[in-house]
Amino acid sequence: MGFCIPLRSKMLKRGSRKSSSILARRPTPKKMNIVTDLENRLKKNSYIENTNQGNILMDSIFVSTMPVETLFGSYITDDSDDYELKDLLNVTYNIKPVIVPDIKLDAVLDRDGNFRPADCFLVKLKHRDGFTKGALYLGHSAGFTATICLKNEGVSGLYIPGTSVIRSNICQGDTIVSRSSRGVQFLPQIGGEAIFLIVSLCPTKKLVETGFVIPEISSNDNAKIAARILSEKRKDTIAHIDTLIQHRQQLELAYYNSCMLTEFLHYCNSYADTIKESLLKETIQKDINITHTNITTLLNETAKVIKLVKSLVDKEDTDIVNNFITKEIKNCGGVKNRDKIVNSLSLSNLDFRL
């Protein structure tokens, strides 16, 4: 099913990873063997700890992967615009409620039958969306929240407040189950679109009748600081990427103007006997010189921004960022006769990749 990350300091030191509490990308899934129903049941999570003092709500983080394309394919390809935009101070995201059959959520249910799926939501993040402060709180305060990545065309980051779980890039299928009272903080989204399925797991009638203790949740101050730093870093990266796209659009326009002015000056020189206005030619040449200066300035500024983005983006994420920039440039419309200008001036040979 997955693995559990207890939030006790002694337990956090265990495992094959470095002592750092920040989780890296998930490893490549291993080939699964066929297991019996009993074995499969034993692999499932347990959200209640049975002690001499009674049932205690666990304060652990459960991390696993799910075959989301098989289970939730219709939600991944859904391009409807019925999401509700939440655009507040330090928070921007799109959300809508959805109905998901319980059978598709079996992987996040506990083996003891103490919790059931209640409400489900789709959260969509676009470039620049996310949380710089605060978190998303959904579901029962005495329950758990399952966060499942259905789609990620960009660089998505996630932090479970008060814990050591910080993910710099969530992959499709990644699943994290945590206490609902902690919330989920989606770090600023870089590049393409991401969609998450949020499942609220509430106590069942059986558990409520049995009774259980809700302990105070622990807190990791160092992780809070790390998450804040990572959030600010991602904001800077987004700003530099936006500047890079803007420079690229301005550069295209400058090349276009340069080409048109040069063609006009050539026309004037070709018909020198007819066009005798030397002042006109001087004005055109002056405009050409100004345009060339702008091009040089833009190229220099672009090189600086590329260097900055390279220093901020993880090496394995550069292709994602490059593809996003290329897509944004193509979608911006640009000037007319773009292909002709680009080809004639070899603009496509300029190095805009990170």
From Swiss-Prot:
Protein name (Swiss-Prot/TrEMBL): Protein OPG055
Induction: Expressed in the late phase of the viral replicative cycle.
Gene from which the chain derives: OPG055
Protein family per UniProt: Belongs to the orthopoxvirus OPG055 family.
Entry keyword set: Late protein
A UniProt-annotated Pfam family: Pox_F11
Function (record text): Stimulates increases in peripheral microtubule dynamics and may increase the motility of the infected cells, contributing to cell-to-cell spread of the virus. Seems to inhibit the signaling via the GTPase RHOA and DIAPH1/mDia.
InterPro entries, sorted: Poxvirus_F11 (IPR007027)
